[in-house]
């Protein structure tokens, strides 16, 4: 993977990834396909929304269907029929959030897995092997995630352990001699001084990109934005910056404003399944009775399949009947909205009009939210 910044408007950046001749423009939003599938839609439909890179979770795929099944197909790309790049999360967050039992030592984590309750040992070495077997284009290091608002000492200990695991991840990743990329993850909770130490030590190890972890876990938005203001300027300018798990539309705007290049989040797909649909002027809650006889499309500025062929009335009906087609059409629309937003952001950076674009975005937003 090669990465290059081509345009800059203040701190907002527009660049390109080159994955073996496949070009991905940044800033980029990655739909989440935890189990090798973006919920309710096919890979062809994912592409038609404008999505070019997706995220899957190595932790979940390790347990279901298991590496043996995926390797029968060659790799995760073949298994799910996706020709584009895939980023895999190592599973650090899931180990700490899903396990009923979790014991940490310097080598890794012993936990009770959520599938069959068996005790499992996961280490940086095992995580790198899993992601190598999956054929991930971007591999994330194995890290320790902690809850928001932990005290300084607990946060420092977790950050230092993540750094130790980062070094181990680098060693084991390099041993596979593949051409994929490895990203480090900056930790340190809400403490800027710990974030500084984490980043500087990760830079010494030298990763292909740097992710900001441990955010969107309950902290006020203003704290997240302050941390981005603090840490993004310190990340090497020639390396991509990835804000993990953050993805409300306004978060994309504010992340890009501060120099972030990559995002992922379940919000567009999860909200779609709950009937919350993003449009130019805000959010439509399609199960509201007022849409029962509404013959208009969701958004007359949207060119997605859903808006071209279906009315709000029909989408309201599908939601009321809990029809699977409703989740599919809603997901197509929300992902198309997100990818159109990212495309417009990129164009505004190229034209040095990002600030005006963001002002217009906020002026239009929240005119409807019902």
Curated annotation (Swiss-Prot):
Keyword terms of this UniProt record: Glycosyltransferase, Metal-binding, Queuosine biosynthesis, Transferase, tRNA processing, Zinc
A matching Pfam family: TGT
Necessary cofactors: Zn(2+)
Chain sites annotated for binding substrate: 89-93, 143, 214
Enzyme class: transferase
A molecular function (GO) term: tRNA-guanosine(34) queuine transglycosylase activity
Residues noted as binding Zn(2+) in the record, renumbered to the chain: 302, 304, 307, 333
EC number in record: 2.4.2.29
Catalytic residues (positions): 89, 264
Biological process according to GO: queuosine biosynthetic process; tRNA wobble guanine modification; tRNA-guanine transglycosylation
Catalytic reaction list: 7-aminomethyl-7-carbaguanine + guanosine(34) in tRNA = 7-aminomethyl-7-carbaguanosine(34) in tRNA + guanine
InterPro entries for this protein: ArchSynthase1/Queuine_TRR, TGT, TGT-like_sf, tRNA_ribo_trans-like
Cofactor: how bound: Binds 1 zinc ion per subunit.
Involved pathway(s): tRNA modification; tRNA-queuosine biosynthesis
GO CC annotation: cytosol
Region (RNA binding): 245-251, 269-273
Quaternary structure (record): Homodimer. Within each dimer, one monomer is responsible for RNA recognition and catalysis, while the other monomer binds to the replacement base PreQ1.
Protein family (similarity comment): Belongs to the queuine tRNA-ribosyltransferase family.
Protein role: Catalyzes the base-exchange of a guanine (G) residue with the queuine precursor 7-aminomethyl-7-deazaguanine (PreQ1) at position 34 (anticodon wobble position) in tRNAs with GU(N) anticodons (tRNA-Asp, -Asn, -His and -Tyr). Catalysis occurs through a double-displacement mechanism. The nucleophile active site attacks the C1' of nucleotide 34 to detach the guanine base from the RNA, forming a covalent enzyme-RNA intermediate. The proton acceptor active site deprotonates the incoming PreQ1, allowing a nucleophilic attack on the C1' of the ribose to form the product.
Name of the molecule in the record: Queuine tRNA-ribosyltransferase
Source species: Buchnera aphidicola subsp. Acyrthosiphon pisum (strain Tuc7)
Classification lineage: Bacteria, Pseudomonadati, Pseudomonadota, Gammaproteobacteria, Enterobacterales
